[in-house]
Structure formats: C-alpha cells, structure tokens
Amino acid sequence: MDYHGGTYDVIVVGAGHAGCEAALASARIGAKTLVITLNLDMIAFMPCNPSIGGPAKGIVVREIDALGGEMAKNIDKTYIQMRMLNTGKGPAVRALRAQADKVLYQREMKKTLENQENLTLLQGKVERLIVEDGVCKGVITHTGAHYYAKAVVITTGTFLRGEIIIGDIKYSSGPNNQQPSIKLSEHLEELGFELVRFKTGTPPRVNSRTIDYSKTEIQPGDKEPRAFSYETTKYITDQLPCWLTYTTEETHRIIDENLHLSPMYSGMIKGTGPRYCPSIEDKVVRFHDKPRHQIFLEPEGRETEEVYVQGLSTSLPEHIQRKLLETIPGLEKAQLMRAGYAIEYDAIVPTQLWPTLETKLVKNLYTAGQINGTSGYEEAAGQGIMAGINAAHRALGREEIILSRSDAYIGVLIDDLVTKGTNEPYRLLTSRAEYRLLLRHDNADLRLTELGYRIGLISEERYQKFLAKKEAIEREKKRLQTVIIKPTPKVQEVIREAGGSELKDGIRAADLLRRPEMTYEHIRKLAPADEEIAPEVAEQVEIQIKYEGYIQKSLQEVERLKKMENKKIPEDIDYDAIQGLATEARQKLKQVRPLSIAQASRISGVNPADISILLVYLEQGRIARVSNE
C-alpha cells in the first residue's frame, strides 16, 4: 500500500563508500538527509579487497579528508597495516595504503552515520524515483513508501541487476550474495538513461590456520606512524603482516586446460571487466611468457581467520579454484572458505552527467560511485562527497561546487567520466593527471581545506590549525631564503657524508637544499631554526623548495588551462547551427554538452580545428540555442 514516508532535503540511495560520504557531507552542511540502504548491517562493506589507498587512490582519500569527509578517519581507526608506497620515487607518486579490518571498518562507519545530526538511516529497497516534468522529487520503496526530497543521490554500487557467475553457474545477486536491485535499474531505463553492462571479480578467501606461511615472504607495515587523516593523532602500533607468494607453472597449466570453463572465455560474461585489475585467467592468457604472478595473502581482520588471496581473482568453477590453490606455495593445504566469483551489473553512461554529478536527463538527481562506471572504494567515496555537497547545495539554494583537474584527483576522475566517458570500469591512475606534481599526497590540505571550510565541512578549530601550518611553512621557507651557510669544517663534513661536493663560498640554505643529495634534516643541522619545526611543515618546506622550478612550470600550465575554463559554453547552445564543425565533433559535443572550451577540448573526437570554429562562433556573440521542449 502506498503511503507518505516523510520529506527531506536530500535522499541518498545506498550506503556503500559513495553513499556514506554523500550522506555525511549533506547532513554536515545542514541538509535534512535520509539514507535508504538494502541492509543496515552492510554499511561501507568491502566486497572485494579489504584495503584503502594505493597509487592515486590514497591521494583521493587525503583529498576527501581535506574537504571534511570521513573515509580517512575511518580507516585510521580500523587498519591492521599501513604502508607508504613508492618512497624511493618522487613526491608526486607517493601514496599511502592500509589493510582494513573490514568488519571493524563497517561497524565504525555505521556508528558515525547513526550519530550524525540531520541524518536518518532506513533499511529498504528503492524501486522507483518520483519524477515530475523532468525533475526528481523523491523515491518509492518496495513497501510503497513515498519519500520526498529536493535532491536525490543514487549510489547503488554493483547492485543494479547484479548477477554472480562462478563457472557455468549464474544467478541474480548483489555482491557477496546480497539481494540485487532489479526494478530500479529497469526504472532508470524507462526514464531514458543509457545503461551499460560492466563486470568485476573477486578472489577466493582461505582459512589462515591452514596456510604454511614458512613458504611465503613476510610483508610488514611501516614502523613510522602514518595516517590518512590530517586530524589523526593516535596511531595503531600492533600491525598485522601480509604475505607474498607466487603462482607456478602448474597453476598456469591448470588455467590453460580449463579456460573453456571460464565464463570470461565461454561467452557467459558479456560485461566489460576492469583493465587494471584482471582475473588470473586473463593474466595467464595475456602474459603467457611470465612464469609466475604475485599473490598477496591479506588478513581480512583481527577477529577472523579469513585471508584474501589478492591476485587470484577468478570466476572459474569452484573445484578448479581448489586445484589452483594447491599449486601455490604456502596454499597447498589451504581450506577454501569462500570461492572467487565474477559479478555483472548495470552502470549508467557517465557522459549523461554534468560535472556536478547531476544527471542531464533528470534535474535534482545525482549519481555517484560504481553506478557511474568506476571501480574502487576510493573513487566511489570521492564522487560521493562531491555529489553529497552538490545535492545539499541544490536543496539549500547554494552554489554548485566543481573541482577542476588542477584542484584534485577527484576533479580528474569526475572530468574524465563526464567528458570522455568510459567503456570499462574506470580506475584512477597517477598517469591520468596532467598536474600530478601539484596533486600530491602531502599537500591535499593546502589544496582543499580552504574550500572544505567555506562549504561548512571543516570546523573552526581545524581551520585555525591549518592556517597556523600554512604560516609556519611560509616562515621557514622565507628563513631558508635568507640564511647563509658558510663553508666551515662541520658544514663540509655534513655535505661530504651526504655524497655532495664541498662548498667554495657561502650559500643560501634554500639553494643548498635544492641539491638532490641534501634533505631538510641536513639543513636543520647546519642552520637550525629558533622554533620547533613540525615534521609536516618540514616536509612541505623541502618539497616546495626542492621542486620549485617544476612546480612553477605546472602552475603556469594551470593558468593557461584556467583561461580556457573561463571561456564558458551555454548549456543549451545549438551545435547544429555552427557551420564547419566535423560530423563526429558535432555528435560528441551534443552528447557531452561541455560547459567550457577547456572541457570541449578534452572530448575524444573533437580536434583543434573544431575548437577554433567553436571559439570564433562564441566570440561573434549571436548564439543559437536549442529549444527546451
């Protein structure tokens, strides 16, 4: 029976990693927010890898924290191991990665949502949207409840018409055998949304007590305290190790002999899988010359014996999975606890979204996470916080917020999705960012905390600490520009020990720091500051001085980009009225409807000649517009 369930500012459908960030951002901004999710016990569930972070992804987690989101704080409370990756490389590619206690992670995030002001949690299944005259007004659940709102955010993950596949077995299911969402998917098609079919997979889990760890290599966490959140002060010290082993030629032989049983190769799986997280079958076929592949054994938590066999993602039949495990050193007698599987699901074509993550087809409707064609918890959470901010701002009559490609990896992610689209589950990589020297792990707060404070997601106390840090960085940089280090015996000894050439004359401390072999610690010994310099301040001072030339070059490129971003294109421009555009360019421009010349220039199929024609047309001022029928 239909009934009125309530009225809110914002409704969030789904409480995975995107939904949690969207709901918390919306509620913290001051919007009365409702979260409807299929199962309250599965909030922030990790159906695949029990980890947060990694290259590019770890920087997204820092950006979420700098804006005032929750993922960083939650993993800092619940990790079992933390490691900084790429420490031997430059600062642009360093990233933090944490193994999560997946059950504790869920529990802590649920507690955070339950205790959040302005936020209501509800278990239920949304089957339809309330859409009137192209505007989303609310949602309808399977019990007939009508909930009304000024904005709705859909964050349904891999649940839309989800199907699990193991060998020749295929059945309707969400991840980890949860119930799927079928009617909502059908309803989105009814509304006119173009959907695509994607696929992802997960490896088997085995019982830790049955692993022979003596045949594997230990992978401990970092001894140095690390954290994702800028606010974390307590660190977990009793970390659990992960373990490294490898597939063997026997593993590969079994896979080759049973490829006909793999749903990927039998034709049972139609969806496109993630390029950068291939199944073991895919790896063996594509890299046939490799004698072995890495397998990481990752504990799923402190209170469980389940171990995630990372690198062995597969949808081969269960009995073949058991045979594969027997060929891997350390896993010969491992007990299978959960079989690996593939899951196919619906996603919307993301070029149907504006950069705010509002849909072009239905006003006041936003989407975030894997429904937009991405893979990964971090990519989902990054979209979630932006969709939550923009939905709340729409409900409260405030300005929309769009992060540019030079602001954040989140900006790169969203721009790639809405401008270029994706024909496979999209994964964020450092190589996707043109300005990666500016978008570092260490400076996410300097890039985004000002914005988080202006929006209302950063507290006054945190903002004042941030300002104090900024001032300390500038003070110390200024000091190092003026202090002269003379070639005394002590100075020459420190430089020699660092592997550098001795000084002939006095040198400014900043210039000495620019030498590749010198660190801030060396400078601290030779020219100590009068005040205590915090490690995070010292880190910024060293990076900003050492890489100043490269950073300035990147900033000049950003300025050029901003000029193109400032050349706006009306949403309703009639591209059919512009003479001279190539047919493909006209089609792509009509589909994406870019909001600036910069965005238009990034669309595949739009070449520089088309951009020149578009610029001339805009500058002449008489712009034809499409009618809003």
UniProtKB/Swiss-Prot annotation:
Tagged with keyword Chaperone: no
Binding site for FAD: 14-19, 126, 181, 370
Cellular compartment(s): Cytoplasm
InterPro entries with a match to the protein in the record: FAD/NAD-bd_sf, GIDA_C_N, MnmG, MnmG-rel, MnmG-rel_CS, MnmG_C, MnmG_C_subdom, MnmG_C_subdom_sf
Gene Ontology CC annotations of this record: cytosol
Residues binding NAD(+): 273-287
GO molecular function, one term: flavin adenine dinucleotide binding
The entry's keywords: Cytoplasm, FAD, Flavoprotein, NAD, tRNA processing
Location (main, coarse): cytoplasm
Pfam families: GIDA, GIDA_C_1st, SAM_GIDA_C
Cofactor needs: FAD
Any GO BP: tRNA wobble uridine modification
PANTHER family: GLUCOSE INHIBITED DIVISION PROTEIN A, PROTEIN MTO1 HOMOLOG, MITOCHONDRIAL
Role this protein plays: NAD-binding protein involved in the addition of a carboxymethylaminomethyl (cmnm) group at the wobble position (U34) of certain tRNAs, forming tRNA-cmnm(5)s(2)U34.
Family of this protein: Belongs to the MnmG family.
Subunit (UniProt): Homodimer. Heterotetramer of two MnmE and two MnmG subunits.
Official protein name in the record: tRNA uridine 5-carboxymethylaminomethyl modification enzyme MnmG
Species this protein is from: Geobacillus kaustophilus (strain HTA426)
Gene symbol of the encoding locus: mnmG
